C-alpha cells in the first residue's frame, strides 16, 4: 500500500470478521473497532467476548508505537490496548465476560457486554 507493508490480523470479537492492520516497520496498529476511547460493544449476538479477549491478547503484545482506532480520538497511546486487555482478563476472572454481563466504565473507555 503506497510502498508500505501492512499485515492483516484477524481479530474477531467485536464481529466475526473483524480485522486490524499491523505495520511492523513503523509500529502502527490500525485497530478498527477492537480498541478506541469510548464504549466498546461486545453485547450483540454477532459479538463474542471470549474471542474479543483472545484478539486483545494477540495484539497487545505487538511492539506498538501508535494505536490508530476507527472512532473518536484517532491517535491514542498504545498502552490503552494493554489496559483494555487487562480489564477483559479481570472480567473473565470475575465471571462477567459474557453477553449480559453489564457495562463497565474505566474512565476513558467502557465495555458493554
What are these regions (language model features)?
Residues 1-61:
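Catalytic core of the metallo-beta-lactamase
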Residues 57-66, 70-113:
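Accessory terminal helices/loops
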Amino acid at each position: 500500500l503506497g510502498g508500505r507493508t501492512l499485515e492483516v490480523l484477524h481479530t474477531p470479537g467485536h464481529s466475526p470478521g473483524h480485522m486490524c492492520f499491523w505495520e511492523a516497520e513503523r509500529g502502527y496498529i490500525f485497530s478498527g473497532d477492537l480498541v478506541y476511547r469510548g464504549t466498546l460493544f461486545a453485547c450483540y449476538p454477532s459479538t463474542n467476548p471470549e474471542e474479543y479477549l483472545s484478539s486483545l491478547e494477540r495484539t497487545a503484545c505487538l511492539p506498538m508505537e501508535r494505536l490508530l482506532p476507527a472512532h473518536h480520538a484517532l491517535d491514542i497511546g498504545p498502552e490503552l490496548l494493554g489496559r483494555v486487555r487487562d480489564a477483559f482478563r479481570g472480567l473473565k476472572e470475575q465471571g462477567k465476560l459474557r453477553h449480559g454481563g453489564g457495562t463497565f466504565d474505566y474512565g476513558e473507555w467502557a465495555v458493554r457486554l
